[in-house]
Each structure stands twice: as C-alpha cells, then as structure tokens.
Amino acid sequence: MAEFVRAQIFGTTFEITSRYTDLQPVGMGAFGLVCSARDQLTAQPVAVKKIMKPFSTPVLSKRTYRELKLLKHLRHENIISLSDIFISPLEDIYFVTELLGTDLHRLISSRPLEKQFIQYFLYQIMRGLKYVHSAGVVHRDLKPSNILINENCDLKICDFGLARIQDPQMTGYVSTRYYRAPEIMLTWQKYDAKVDVWSAACIFAEMLLGAPLFPGKDHVNQFSIITELLGTPPDDVIQTICSENTLRFVKSLPKREPQDLAKLPKFLALVHPDKKPEEDEDYKNTINLLKAMLVYNPKDRISAEAALAAPYLAPYHDETDEPVAEEKFDWSFNDADLPVDTWKIMMYSEILDFHNIDQGGDINPALVEGAGLNQQGFQ
C-alpha cells in the first residue's frame, strides 16, 4: 500500500502519494485543481490534477472515465501524456502528467508573438489535431488555455474532458464561446472534427492580433460578430438549422456581405513594412490559410491534415513526421447509462491496466490506492 500525505491547496485537500512533493497551485477549473509537483522517482517536475468528487454523480463519473480512457489511448508528441494515475483513500482521482511552463493564453496576454513562433505553434496544434481526429476523437473545447507550452516551444493539447466521438449526430452545448464553431451555435447537432479546425482558426487569429477574433458577450452577440466579418451564412448552412427559434433569429439578422480579411486594418498591420499586401507572399499565405479555416460550412472547411500542407506551414511540414493513430478510440462505453458504482469499478479496472497489474477476478478497490507504486521500481 502506498503512503499518502495531505496538503491544503486553495482550501482543497490534496491527498497524494509520497512520491510527489513540493505542491504548488497552477490552475483551477470546473472539474479539477492542478498543482505542480516534483516526482521523487524521476526528479522531474510534473502536473498533478485532482478530479473533484469524481463519483458524486453518474455524469461526473462518466466524464472522468472518458478522460482517463482518452489519455491512455492518445499517445502523440503534441498531446499531453499521462504518467501516473491513482485514487486516494478519500476516493479522489489524481492524474499525473508532464509539466509545461505556461499556456498559450498566458503567452498571448504577455507579449506580441513573433511570426516564426505563431507558425510553429499553429503547426503543432494542427499536427496534434490530425492525430486526434484520425483516432475518431473531437476535442470540442480547444482554446488557448488548453494549449500548453514549455521553454523549448514544444506544444501539447490538454483537457480532453469534453472530447467526443466523431459522429454526424453529435449534440451538445460545448466549447468556450469565443472559439465555438457556427455549426454548434446554429444547429446543436450534426457536427464533426471540423469544429476543432474552427477553434484553431480563432486561436490562430488571436496569436496574430493579440486579442480574440470573435469576443462575443453572449451567444447572440457571438454569432452577430461572426457575421460582421464573414457575412450572412449561405443558404446551404441555413438549411441545416433544426431549431425554429434559431432559424428565426438568423433570418432576422440584416443581410451582410463578407469582408475581405486581407484588407482589414487589423490584419494589414501584419504586412511587411517594405512591401505592399499583394507583394507579401507570407501575408497572403497567412490570410489564405485563415480563410480556409474560417468557412461556415464544415464540409468546405479545410481539415487539420490538409492545413498542415498549406504554404503557410511549409517551413515545418513533413508528412513523414505527422503520424495518425494506430487504431480508432473505442467509444463503446459512451452511450452507456450506468450507476456510479459501475463506473467506479470500470475506473479501477482502467487504473490497474495502466499500471500493468493483473486483475485476476474481482477488483479490490484497495489495490487501486496508489496502484502501480510497487511496480517496475516505483516506490
């Protein structure tokens, strides 16, 4: 049995194994608190995420199980990787991952980003999305604060708690407003991996401009701001709207023509000072990729894989080093409506599997407390 120690962080009890020391809070979300820590086994800094009350409701249990399964399955240089997981005696779940120094939101807020950094960051985002989408997974909540970066400019996408299967009937009200694709706002159904490409486009523009491209105050204002830039949605998009209220709202908006992004003052500021916009190939490549990502109809929106081959990302593009998933993620559990105790047993099973512990018969929850800490040289 592993030895557990307790610490109070922001009024929350962190109950972790003695393997991890020097806890410092780094962030808090709706579903968990994240601390940095030192891994005594590897002498490396790590991030320890406490999942708040994972077994309080079936919905939270399922969400935690989904995130655990995804973190186990997704193995890619641009996706955060799981190094340890355990359940404390208080039945809180802790995910341990690599620690990166900052996130893209903090970086954008602190200083203007130079062109080569924007290119490299976008390349890594799209490289990660190509892999995620090839696994049959849609992130659904891509935003600057979910994109982690270290001192070497290595980038990793994190927080897969809202991720879902690629399904033409996918539904739900997801994604932080500024980065939300129009098909989510308009239909609440029939969307796919292209919602992540839209979010990536909004992040791309934010890196270029230093401020959100579509800073809507609410759901209605958000869509109105999008139409100011991209014009009224075309008929083929409007025809997909299923909600009568949404359809009435869209038809009530004034008819707007799309603006030419390349001629907008906020983008013209990106043109090389010694060149005209039409002479600046880098500028044209920048705007062309952004336009291809900001298309109303997801069928016509560029994919993550195709974006990697765009001229803007040519300095980094290498098709032989942009892997896809070896197999699709198994979503068979996703439609299950199960009680908490069943999700708990399934969670225990996944944790034991992560630590390569033979489950042999009934699962004993006590085995999972600090699971794996006596395996493979662990403390």
Swiss-Prot record:
Keywords: Activator, ATP-binding, Cytoplasm, Kinase, Nucleotide-binding, Nucleus, Phosphoprotein, Serine/threonine-protein kinase, Transcription, Transcription regulation, Transferase. It is an enzyme of class 2 (transferase). SMART domains: S_TKc. It is found in: Cytoplasm; Nucleus. The TXY motif contains the threonine and tyrosine residues whose phosphorylation activates the MAP kinases. A motif (TXY) lies at residues 171-173. This is Mitogen-activated protein kinase hog1. GO terms for cellular component: cytoplasm; nucleus. The active site is at residue 141. Gene3D superfamilies: Phosphorylase Kinase, domain 1 (3.30.200.20), Transferase(Phosphotransferase) domain 1 (1.10.510.10). Dually phosphorylated on Thr-171 and Tyr-173, which activates the enzyme. Phosphorylated by pbsB in response to osmotic and oxidative stresses. The modification Phosphothreonine is found at residue 171. Its EC number is 2.7.11.24. GO terms for molecular function: ATP binding; MAP kinase activity; protein serine kinase activity; protein serine/threonine kinase activity. Its cofactor is Mg(2+). InterPro entries: Kinase-like_dom_sf, MAP_kinase, MAP_kinase_CS, Prot_kinase_dom, Protein_kinase_ATP_BS, Ser/Thr_kinase_AS. Activated by tyrosine and threonine phosphorylation. Proline-directed serine/threonine-protein kinase involved in a signal transduction pathway that is activated by changes in the osmolarity of the extracellular environment. Controls osmotic regulation of transcription of target genes. ATP binds at residues 26-34, 49. GO terms for biological process: cellular hyperosmotic response; cellular response to oxidative stress; establishment or maintenance of cell polarity; hyperosmotic response; osmosensory signaling pathway; protein phosphorylation; stress-activated MAPK cascade. It catalyses: L-seryl-[protein] + ATP = O-phospho-L-seryl-[protein] + ADP + H(+); L-threonyl-[protein] + ATP = O-phospho-L-threonyl-[protein] + ADP + H(+). Belongs to the protein kinase superfamily. Ser/Thr protein kinase family. MAP kinase subfamily. HOG1 sub-subfamily. Residues 20-313 form the Protein kinase domain. It comes from Emericella nidulans (strain FGSC A4 / ATCC 38163 / CBS 112.46 / NRRL 194 / M139). The modification Phosphotyrosine is found at residue 173.
